[in-house]
Amino acid sequence: MSDLLNTLGIAPINSGGFGGDWVGSGPEVEVATPIDGSRIASVKTVTEDEYEQIVGQAAHAFNAWRNVPAPQRGEVVRQLGDRLRAAKRDLGALVTLEVGKIAAEGEGEVQEMIDICDFACGLSRQLYGLTMPSERVDHRMYEQWHPLGVVGVVSAFNFPVAVWSWNAALGAVCGNSTVWKPASRTPLTAIAVTRLAEEVCRANNVDPAVFSLTIGGGSTIGERLVQDRRVGLISVTGSCEVGHHVAGVVGQRLGRTILELGGNNAIVVTAHANLDVALPAILFGAIGTAGQRCTSTRRIICHRSVRSELVNRLKRAYAGVRIGDPRQPETLMGPLATLDAVENLMQAVARVKSEGGEVLCGGDRLEDEAHPGGHYVTPCLAAATNDLAIVQEETFGPILYIIDYGSADATLAQSVDEVEEAVTLHNAVPQGLSSAIFTEHLREAEYFVSACGSDCGIANVNIGTSGAEIGGAFGGEKETGGGRESGTDAWRAYMRRQTNTINRSTELPLAQGIKFGD
């Protein structure tokens, strides 16, 4: 472990703030791995005075960065992507160590950063406005998009670096600087990535405060960032409760937000589904990252005619899930991130039973020698109805609810009409992030992605709820928050729109033909 940390510039005790210089004289936070509870390193958090210094430096960096031509900004971001690519294996290993993701997912998160850097570089030559015809003679009207300023990014523990990159890479090519507040329980990957960004900036004679960092408590540093009028846009990944608070605070100062909050994602499995395709998608969605993704599959809305076969196949698959040290290549599910997460899962399992559902398998703690530290559980499969209170909530862990729809003796033709019932159940939760349907029938697929279908920001056909690509806009509706990260036009969220009218005549005609004065 020490070789890995040394390679990435992680010391036994690290400064938790960066705005061109590394600072941190606040309380020290010890970071332990959920793999076995052992210490990784410590971080000195930033004080409120240091926060002021960092945001001031980020604002100063913006003043110069916004004047750099966008394609040149894109080149800097491209180089950051190359630097991340070279460090992919080491950074992925640190994600695994800090979060508990299996090795493939740790490296996959780093690949997301690489992908968005490549994507943002391409967009740096496409930050275009439109020219509109003017109703006035010898006038031209057009729009421009200008950099917004300082962008604040509050990321969550489950994707400790990828979500930052979605905002920072696009924000940077748009001419903004970024102040990043990562989750306090996963700060080391943030420090490692910021060090790489610093190297790239210095190599290009760019003020490295373009990529600033503030590690501290949510109630102190996080709250300062949300309230700060110098920060024009706040992107927050977190719970619905946190999102409501942030939206209220930022709304009071008429700032902008991108909110990626809770998900209660469902897969509809129809009578026409190919279960050979559906099964691995369900498994990856439900137990990947130990069920700690915003897009994790929480519900299966299954046609009664295929329920028995699907449940039996899921039980066999769950029994074969290899749970343990995520650094080992054979492991499919690692630990939950915290002991609180374990307790929340245990409470959810108990509530399923008390509210009238049935636990079909799993939902137990693993506390033997092969699973040290108390963070390991078996994934839970439960039968439930959609209206159970626990089903309406998001439990951030590997619990999957099987919910029935349709008639067991319906003909295949009749079952197509029953997809409306499935969609009604699907949409009857407060959240609206990601969704999917598995079917070989065109009518069912088209209905699901129509205006009458899924009410989520993401709706897939024959692919699961997890595993979004950079080219698609990511975000949701309802309690999931609103706003989008990544995607073809997400850059507009990081810029301000300006309309320009140019008069090349020697007169001053007014719009709408208004006559004013003599």
What label would you give each PLM region?
Residues G37, R73, V95, C117, ...:
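Residue-level signal for inorganic ion chemistry
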Residues G129-V277, A413-V416:
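Rossmann-like NAD(P) dinucleotide-binding subdomain of oxidoreductase/dehydrogenase enzymes
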Residues V23-G24, T45-D49, A273, E367:
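A short acidic/small-residue loop/turn micro-motif
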Residues H60-A64, D82-R89, G100, G122, ...:
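Generic secondary-structure signature for well-ordered alpha-helical cores
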Residues S38-L127:
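Glycine-rich loop-to-alpha-helix module at the N-terminal edge of alpha/beta enzyme cores
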